[in-house]
Amino acid sequence: MVRFILFLLVSNFVMSQSYYVYVASESDDTVSLLKFQNNEINELERITVGTYPTEIEGPHGITVDPNGKFWYLSLAHGNPFGKLVKYSTESNEILGETTLGLFPASMQVSTTTGFLYCVNFNLHGSMKPSTVSVVDPVTMTEITTITTGSMPHGSRISTDGLFQYSVAMMSGELFEVDALSLEVSRTLDLENKIIKKDVTKHSMDGMKSMDGMKSMDGMKSMDGMK
């Protein structure tokens, strides 16, 4: 009987947990704070973002600091440069901002360095190599920029916080950036991989031996990373 009661208590505790998510509406210049609980979802707050009320500034990338105290938003449509804005998760008020590159997009904070890494997508610019902005989120200062490929997007940090990855959409490359040295450590030419693949072979053996899929040890073991 005791075990049964404990099971009920644990089950009720798990089911009553609440989860929160921030969702950016790029064409509306707003960010919604949503709450998930049980089978329900509710919008708790709708936050107006941007500086110019007559212009759409395009909230694009959004991420929450690993400590859960702050959230960060990239405003992509700049004149010409975009901005990174820091907010409090407690009050959803602005705590600071800094200017980044052309069309700053997706980003994440490294648990190892504490820096924020944001790709500058450069959606409306010429098809030339763009950059990753490295920001100190404490002082909201852009420390440096790292040149990668054309129209980088999809910024992700490895679970150990040591590497940042992004895909250059127009140059067809995957870039690995060393989060400590702040330099490109390896690249993978995705387009050549696709071109060289023999599409006439459909066996599962061929799938198992595809370049770049030899281990599940992360991208460090991928063939073709230079």
Question: Which positions does each model-derived feature cover?
Answer:
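Predominantly soluble domains enriched in secretory-pathway, periplasmic, or organellar proteins
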Residues: 16-226
